[in-house]
Design a protein with these regions (language model features):
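LRR N-terminal entry segment and analogous cap-like coil->beta motifs
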Residues: 29-34, 44-85
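The feature encodes a structural signal of leucine-rich repeats
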Residues: 42, 64-67, 87-90, 110-113, ...
């Protein structure tokens, strides 16, 4: 009975390998028993050798629970979003550790012992004031590494040699120069946001397995042809850069499924962008686009198109040829009217044309579109009218208050 009570009220998940096989439980779905008024660290004293999964995230911990070092069979340890300042060198004793998540703490240094955890598959030490990391060359099973938002000024060579890596996030570092990434040939996902780049790092063209690439919040002025030619690329995010034009070679991005190029300096877009065979999500918001191509092709497979916060004054009627569209945003442009034929978009669910100076809207045609669930049609003129009405109403209320106080 005593063992049952202790197990019921513990913070952590206690699984034996036999239980895990019986329940067919995956590593990324640990059982979580939450009781905020319990002392989670105390639970570590209960058969620590049987513990394989621990989640102490968001527990306001200021120190690494030293009792954890007794959990020699632990496979997953999560200590994210606390106020831990250091990791003990003794962490090397957790030889079976496969997943270590210690992001968003106050850790200033990573012990050398962490580099000897050869079973590690996933490591997240992001968002800590760390300025150096140990030699990771022994972590040959590591396939996910997040070292974003650290104080690193260089990326260690030991990381650049980890051919097992599939997912690497090196965003928001303090790099003075960017290394060649060509050795990381097995990368599927790469994040280099907020790196003050004016051009992409060398070796990108060698990452032939890369599927997701994000390089937002940089100073890029163009998209290199080599990136568009990556044979496996599906998701490309280049938002908040200084890109002024899209190359005609965009037509070579035949595998692209999602493209986010919002927050740049585009004034036009090539028609080839709309004919990409697999492109379904396109975000062109917050640019300076004045016109769209007149000859948008009928074979477009776009489902989501965001053109909000641009400078469009007219839309081509051929836009309605994008018959796969389910979400379309034209909010905050300079549109005064819409071309006829919008009812051809029979799959459209969300349509936002608010904050435009419309003089006329084909409202009857829009209302025949049975698939529409969300329509935003408030114009700039309407907003200004309501604002003026609000000011007038406020003035009236102010003028009658003295009378109300006097009981008149």
């Amino acid at each position: 009975m005593k063992s049952f009570i202790l197990t019921l009220f513990c913070f952590i998940s206690v699984w034996t390998s036999v239980q895990a096989q019986q329940e067919n439980t995956q590593l990324d779905k640990p059982l979580k028993l939450k009781r905020r008024d319990a002392k989670g660290v105390e639970d570590l004293k209960f058969k620590p050798e049987e513990i394989t999964h621990i989640n102490f995230s968001r527990r306001r911990l200021t120190e690494f629970p030293i009792e954890l070092l007794k959990c020699t069979n632990i496979e997953e340890l999560t200590l994210s979003f606390n106020e831990i300042q250091s990791i003990p060198e003794g962490i090397y004793s957790l030889k079976k550790l496969k997943r270590l998540l210690i992001s968003n703490n106050k850790i200033s240094s990573i012990p050398e012992g962490l580099g000897s955890l050869t079973e590690l598959e996933i490591l997240d030490i992001s968002s800590n004031p760390v300025n150096t990391v140990p030699d990771f060359s022994a972590l040959q099973k590591l396939h996910v590494l997040n070292i974003s938002s650290l104080q690193l000024t260089t990326i260690p060579k030991s990381i650049l040699g980890l051919e097992s890596l599939n997912d690497l996030n090196i965003s928001n570092l303090q790099l003075t120069s960017f290394p060649d990434l060509s050795q990381l040939k097995n990368l599927h996902s790469l994040g280099i946001d907020g790196s003050r780049l004016t051009e992409l790092p060398a070796g990108i063209e060698k990452l032939i397995l890369l599927r997701t690439f994000t390089a937002s919040n940089n100073a890029l002025t163009s998209i290199p042809k080599a990136v568009l030619a990556l044979p496996a690329l599906r998701n490309l995010t280049l938002s908040k850069n200084a890109i002024t034009a899209l190359p005609i070679d965009i037509k070579n991005a035949e595998t692209l499924f999602s493209l986010d190029i919002s927050g740049n300096k585009l004034t036009t877009v090539p028609k080839e962008l709309f004919s990409l065979a697999r492109l379904q999500n396109l975000n062109l918001s917050e640019n300076q686009i004045r016109v769209l191509p007149n000859d948008i092709p009928e074979n477009s497979v776009l489902k989501e198109l965001d053109l909000s916060y641009n400078a469009l004054t007219l839309l081509p009627q051929t836009l309605w040829k994008c018959k796969s569209l389910t979400n379309l945003s034209l909010e905050s442009n300079l549109l005064t009217t819409l071309p006829n034929g919008i009812s051809a978009l029979q799959d459209l669910n969300t349509f936002n044309i608010g904050k435009n100076p419309f003089e006329s809207i084909p409202i009857k045609e829009i209302m025949t579109m049975s698939s529409l669930r969300d329509i935003g049609i408030v114009s700039r003129k309407e907003i200004e009218r309501r604002r003026e009405e609000g000011k007038l109403q406020k003035a009236k209320e102010t003028s009658v208050k003295p009378e109300l106080k006097n009981g008149k």
